[in-house]
């Protein structure tokens, strides 16, 4: 029963039931593995800036932990859903054109972001454009890298 207890206390069962990634207390979680979440959480600092290609529960999770989250979303329905929950330190943009979506990061100076998450569309182009925008010790997260 230890494994079942972990599934409950981690929020995994609740996430399955709700259809979104949340912890036991219904707080948002990135849809990453639990070890990945723990690894990233240990590295986060309150003055970090995060850029996300694709918004979601991770947007809300990062927003609770860092200074600024900038997310670009291509899906209008998902954009509206996340926008309704986003706190003040989240800048969320809707860009349906895949080239404009990938290039949104170019609005920011090189070395501006501590973490860049690539989850949404046009991943190859996003990867080409984003690496210069990282700080010297920055981290790029390729989420669901098997997606096209």
Regions from the language model: what does each represent?
Residues 49-52, 71, 114-118, 140-142:
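Short catalytic-loop micro-motif centered on adjacent basic/acidic residues
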Residues 98-106, 139, 145:
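Glycosyltransferase catalytic domains, chiefly GT-A lineage
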Residues 101-103, 120-123:
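Active-site glycine-rich loop that binds ribose-phosphate moieties when present
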Residues 46-48, 67, 111-113, 136-137:
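Short coil/turn segments at beta-strand junctions that form active-site/ligand-binding loops
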Residues 3-47:
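Class I SAM-dependent methyltransferase Rossmann-like catalytic core
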């Amino acid at each position: 029963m230890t494994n079942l207890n972990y599934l409950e206390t981690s929020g995994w069962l609740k996430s399955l039931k709700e259809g979104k990634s949340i912890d036991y207390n219904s707080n948002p979680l990135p849809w990453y593995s639990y070890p990945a979440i723990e690894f990233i959480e240990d590295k986060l600092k309150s003055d970090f800036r995060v850029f996300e290609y694709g918004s979601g529960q991770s947007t809300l999770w990062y927003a609770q932990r860092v200074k600024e989250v900038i997310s670009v979303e291509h899906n209008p329905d998902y954009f509206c859903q996340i926008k309704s929950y986003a706190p003040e330190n989240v800048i969320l943009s809707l860009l349906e054109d895949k080239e404009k979506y990938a290039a949104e990061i170019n609005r920011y100076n090189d070395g501006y972001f501590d973490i860049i998450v690539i989850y949404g569309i046009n991943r190859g182009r996003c990867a080409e454009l984003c690496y210069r925008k990282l700080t010297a010790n920055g981290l790029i997260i390729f989420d669901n890298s098997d997606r096209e």
